[in-house]
Amino acid sequence: MRELRNTKIIAVDHGYGNMKTANTVTPTGIKAYETEPIFTGNILEYNGIYYRIGEGHKEFIPDKAMDEEYYLLTLMAIARELNVFSIREADVHLAAGLPLTWIRNQREDFRSYLLQNPEVHYRSNSKEYHLRFVGCSLYPQGYPAIVNRLGDFKGTNLLADIGNGTMNILYINNKKAQESRCWTEKFGVNQCMIAAKNAVLDNFGVKIEESTVEQILRFGTADISASYLDCITAVARQYVTDIFATLRKYEYNPGLMRLYVVGGGGCLIRNFGTYDKSRVTIIDDICATAKGYESLAYMSLKRRG
């Protein structure tokens, strides 16, 4: 969070797997309850309905403005960011993003969606919040994650933002983003998750918890028997192979350019990929894009005076 003229600038990176702010990460799962849930932890109370947030992930949808749950997830994300600073009431300027090639067509609808209520009262984890939305800045996903290190982007560079639902690809030549050379592929980490779960079911006839697969993808291992681990590892290696094949489709050549990877897919490349570490930079900070949104919005609003 940043502050400018008594307005709190709060960035929210609306991922299919996680909602990120500059200082918080929350899985996108959401379940409604008519009465207060028995167990505590990330409970949102809005318009008389209780929502448990953070169990599992949401399924891919191409237009988030068509899904009311992303509005609720946004309220939770804002509350969690404000809670870091012990703030309960604020004038809020939102900073968010959309996939590279979708932002042109979806920008205004998504802005209207996020600003649908100028003033909101709700409870998050038993704490009252009162928000007044005063504006919203929207940016292309991925690029903001590296905006503070553009000085490193000499020559030809390829940026791959590999999220849970999509992979955004952008060329950056001599510190300048090439708008005519950007693509969005529906090839996110969730594709690997689905393939891994199916492989375990096909090979062993059992279902595996998604949280177990996620631990393997993030850290390269988990407390399971070697046969299951080998099965999932093989799927993950193939997924990373397919990532590089997709990048080559867009003329990626490691000898001629540097590759920068942001998003959750970076840990899969690190854990299961074969690549030249001197030519590939993996940005581990899962909140990097949200921090970039925040910085860009702050600079833009400051210039306006």
Residue ranges and their predicted role:
Residues 21, 169-171:
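Conserved blade-register residue in beta-propeller folds
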Residues 162-168:
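Ser/Thr-glycine-rich phosphate-binding loops at phosphate-binding pockets of nucleotides
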